[in-house]
């Protein structure tokens, strides 16, 4: 982040405007205060605004309400790679669009799951993370159970949606629960995949048949070892990002870039009719 500020300081004297493209928003998960935490993301955005940044471009920010930290002179543009991911998923996977359920692994990802579900005209389910407030492990209250809230999964294709995989433990526990509930196939979709605890857990879960594939993007660094696995499908968002940058640079409208629903709906209709 300091390097970004140095570059801004170096160029802002001559630049007509400064746009910062930050696919994974700095400190985006430190976005609210529950106890005595610092509001790192809000402070970072205000620093960029004070340095004269006119626009910040980011993708699938953890909480879009963070833009309220800079409501005036800096434009905050949050894009979703949802349609780019869905195009690849619909094209590559065999599934019945009439037997799909979208699953949120916790309450925070529910809006994402609902968007996907509305595109497919499908049902949505959710897991509630039950935590043990008497203990603190790695700075957090440990999760003791994932409680499923939703309809019957017997014979369904379950698609788990989240913005980020850190260690991936919760995602894999959810996948295991879905298989126990009778889901025929389980797919995982995440914009950012960090694999902070390595790949062993995912490799074992895949070998055990807990999930079919993980769809993720190249909007942040991904270990080459993950890309080489049979269960990881990387979605290239380079063209999407370049279209955004070019449109902003030429003062064009970004509305079309934020709305690609019709293409997905057409692909889904073709899938239902066996034409894809």
Question: What are these language model-derived features?
Answer:
Residues 1-276:
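PRPP-associated nucleotide enzymes
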């Amino acid at each position: 982040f300091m390097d970004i500020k140095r570059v801004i300081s170096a160029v802002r004297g001559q630049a007509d405007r400064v746009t910062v493209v930050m696919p994974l928003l700095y400190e985006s998960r430190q976005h609210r205060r529950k106890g005595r935490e610092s509001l790192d993301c809000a402070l970072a955005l205000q620093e960029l605004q004070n340095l004269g940044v006119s626009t910040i471009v980011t993708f699938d920010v953890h909480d879009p309400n963070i833009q309220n930290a800079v409501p005036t002179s800096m434009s905050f543009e949050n894009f979703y790679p949802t349609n780019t991911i869905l195009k690849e998923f619909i094209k590559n996977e065999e599934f019945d669009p009439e037997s799909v359920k979208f699953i949120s692994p916790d309450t925070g990802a529910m809006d994402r799951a609902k968007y996907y579900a509305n595109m497919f005209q499908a049902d949505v389910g959710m897991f509630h993370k039950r935590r043990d407030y008497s203990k603190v492990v790695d700075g957090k209250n440990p999760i003791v159970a994932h409680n499923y809230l939703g309809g019957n999964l017997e014979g369904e294709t379950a698609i788990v949606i989240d913005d980020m995989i850190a260690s991936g433990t919760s995602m894999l526990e959810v996948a295991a629960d879905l298989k126990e509930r009778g889901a025929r196939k389980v797919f995982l979709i995440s914009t950012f995949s960090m694999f902070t605890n390595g790949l062993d857990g995912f490799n074992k879960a895949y070998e055990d048949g807990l999930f079919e594939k993980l769809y993720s993007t190249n909007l942040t660094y991904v270990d080459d070892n993950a890309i080489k696995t049979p269960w990881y499908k990387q979605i290239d968002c380079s063209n999407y990002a370049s279209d955004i940058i070019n449109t902003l640079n030429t003062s064009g409208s970004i509305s079309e870039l934020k709305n690609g629903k019709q293409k997905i709906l057409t692909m889904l209709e073709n899938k239902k009719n066996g034409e894809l």
